[in-house]
Amino acid sequence: MKVGIIGAMEEEVNLLRNELTERVDTEIANYHFYEGYLGNMQVVILKSGIGKVNAAIGTTLLIDKFKPDVVINTGSAGGFKKGMKVGDVVVSTEVRHHDVDVTAFGYEYGQVPGMPPAYEADAKLVSVCKDVIENLPDVNVHQGLIVTGDSFINDSKRVADILGHFDGVAAVEMEAAPIAQTCYQFGVPFVVTRSISDSADEEANLSFDEFLETASINSAKMVMAVTKRLEQA
């Protein structure tokens, strides 16, 4: 098995990249790929850059050029669920766009024409992630809907707008839906796991800057534990 791992930012991939053995670096169209092994698991890590277009292009290159069997999207997110704390980890049950509106033509809010309203994460990967995280010390795990848009959400009015369109939102971020959509189109199983860096409120930018490192460390721990579990499966 080969696992594709996607993080948007340097902080979200550097810990994993530094753990690779037999590492090979490749650059394609300004996207950076890092092949190697985490333990005995063959992986390829993509630093995609921030935002939906970057994520979609990078994921397409990852799948087309490196042929991963599964894809894990990791990194940070803004938390929506009550009781969620910075450093907690969210595992996606499904992923949707929160900034797509073609409802005038009969589509659901968030649905891209010709695509499903939601992209369901692979049930086996969700189960593995949940089980692994529950056994990590000092990390709380949540499951739920992750929504994606090309904006950093730090406004309670925008939070209310998102919650008005979707039930059960666990977290918001900027890359998961196009990654999920690309995996759907290529038929590659995926899961999104995000560590909470902020609460998507008016203090979100300050919280994000302060807690990105914590969120990134927790995400890296989780991904390494998941690849180890998949290696044993």
From Swiss-Prot:
The lineage of its organism: Bacteria, Bacillati, Bacillota, Bacilli, Bacillales. GO terms for biological process: L-methionine salvage from methylthioadenosine; L-methionine salvage from S-adenosylmethionine; nucleoside catabolic process. InterPro entries: MTA_SAH_Nsdase (IPR010049), Nucleoside_phosphorylase_d (IPR000845), Nucleoside_phosphorylase_sf (IPR035994). Gene3D superfamilies: Nucleoside phosphorylase domain. Keywords: Amino-acid biosynthesis, Hydrolase, Methionine biosynthesis. The active site is at 12 (proton acceptor), 198 (proton donor). One of its GO terms (molecular function) is adenosylhomocysteine nucleosidase activity. This is 5'-methylthioadenosine/S-adenosylhomocysteine nucleosidase. It is an enzyme of class 3 (hydrolase). It comes from the Bacteria. Its EC number is 3.2.2.9. It comes from Exiguobacterium sp. (strain ATCC BAA-1283 / AT1b). It catalyses: S-adenosyl-L-homocysteine + H2O = S-(5-deoxy-D-ribos-5-yl)-L-homocysteine + adenine; S-methyl-5'-thioadenosine + H2O = 5-(methylsulfanyl)-D-ribose + adenine; 5'-deoxyadenosine + H2O = 5-deoxy-D-ribose + adenine. Pathway: Amino-acid biosynthesis; L-methionine biosynthesis via salvage pathway; S-methyl-5-thio-alpha-D-ribose 1-phosphate from S-methyl-5'-thioadenosine (hydrolase route): step 1/2. Substrate binds at residues 78, 153, 174-175. GO terms for cellular component: cytosol. Pfam families: PNP_UDP_1 (PF01048). Catalyzes the irreversible cleavage of the glycosidic bond in both 5'-methylthioadenosine (MTA) and S-adenosylhomocysteine (SAH/AdoHcy) to adenine and the corresponding thioribose, 5'-methylthioribose and S-ribosylhomocysteine, respectively. Also cleaves 5'-deoxyadenosine, a toxic by-product of radical S-adenosylmethionine (SAM) enzymes, into 5-deoxyribose and adenine. Belongs to the PNP/UDP phosphorylase family. MtnN subfamily.
